[in-house]
């Protein structure tokens, strides 16, 4: 997501990144900011890269992955500085550089996923309550991908429905997976019923 200003008014714009010049449409306006969606990238940022995540255009987990990694770290530092200044009213404070990693993938040890009708397991699509199915995530540990696959296989085999948020029907609502450095895994399945009934 990019941030731009027009006559001092701030817009948060989906589909662009730091340094892009874009044509965008206004999706919504609030009192102090607006939300926009990129229609066309007029000039690509010199910091733009192709995201390695196949879901990055739909989910928020990898929204910075179309930005060079050193710029991601710089941007995160600036976000902290700006929040301290704007929210905390702290002007004169040293914010050290964000510590990066050699391989910025497969590092996250906790994944939270929505489960929906049709055995969908994934994230909400950006700005909606519609589930975007995910089979693998480049920021989660590989073990998380295995758990997602096993839960889906279980649901299909035993005809256990995912939760339909619109009709408030179905059983499995959420999946939470935590992993440790020594490869232990904790799996939490959130249901709408006290017992997991299956045939």
Can you describe what each PLM-predicted range is?
Residues 1-199:
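Accessory RNA-recognition modules of RNA-modification enzymes
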């Amino acid at each position: 997501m990019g941030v731009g200003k027009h006559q001092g008014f701030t817009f948060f714009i989906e589909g662009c990144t730091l340094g892009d010049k874009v044509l965008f449409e206004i999706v919504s306006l609030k009192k102090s900011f607006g939300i926009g969606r990129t229609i066309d990238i007029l000039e690509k940022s010199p910091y733009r890269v192709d995201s390695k995540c196949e879901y990055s255009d739909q989910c928020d987990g990898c929204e910075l992955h179309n930005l060079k990694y050193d710029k991601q770290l710089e941007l995160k530092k600036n976000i902290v500085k700006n929040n301290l200044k704007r929210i905390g009213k702290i002007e004169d404070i040293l914010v050290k550089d964000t510590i990066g990693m050699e391989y910025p993938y497969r590092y996250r040890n906790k994944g939270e996923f929505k489960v929906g009708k049709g055995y969908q397991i994934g994230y909400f699509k950006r700005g909606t309550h519609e589930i975007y199915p995910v089979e693998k995530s480049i920021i989660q540990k590989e073990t998380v991908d295995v758990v997602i696959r096993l839960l889906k296989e279980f649901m299909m085999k035993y005809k256990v429905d995912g939760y339909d948020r619109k009709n408030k029907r179905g059983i499995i609502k959420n999946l939470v997976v935590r992993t440790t450095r020594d490869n232990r895994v904790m799996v939490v399945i959130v249901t709408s019923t006290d017992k997991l009934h299956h045939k």
